[in-house]
Amino acid sequence: IWKKIADYYKNEPVILGYDLINEPIAPYFENMDELNAKLEPLHKRVTAAIREVDPNHIIMLGAPQWNGNFKPFKDWNYDDKLMWTCHRYGGDPIRPAIMNFIEFRDSTDMPMYMGEIGHNTDEWQETFCKTMEEANIGYTFWPYKKIRNSCFSGIVPPENWEKIIEF
């Protein structure tokens, strides 16, 4: 499927790149370690398929466990247009809280892109965006579909909402 997608978008200048798998392998999967070991070979196969039709666009590699665990990756020299992508919701909005991403990025000499941040307080967002900019990490503000929070779109829960979600 990725080869077909890449063939369709190969000449589109508005496409930043291809984010192969969003948040692969949840941390609660019983066979998480087994699946983690299969992710890098999958990335390589998909990258090769994309490169058959599109040599130009960036390919974003998401890590397992909500795009946060980069330990399974051992080889990143198979393409010259790869970029890591990570996600961050909550926690401290300061540099020490994302040092694992910064250190991994620096050890691989590849860019890191924070593909999702959001649904925190305005103060948290302001601090975290400054942290990302100082760390030279691009980011996407992703606060969609939230309840009772600052975001692009959200809802005020209807009366008895708690009863619905408790059901």
Locations of regions flagged by a protein language model:
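Extracellular glycoside hydrolase catalytic/binding regions
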Residues: 3-146, 151-166
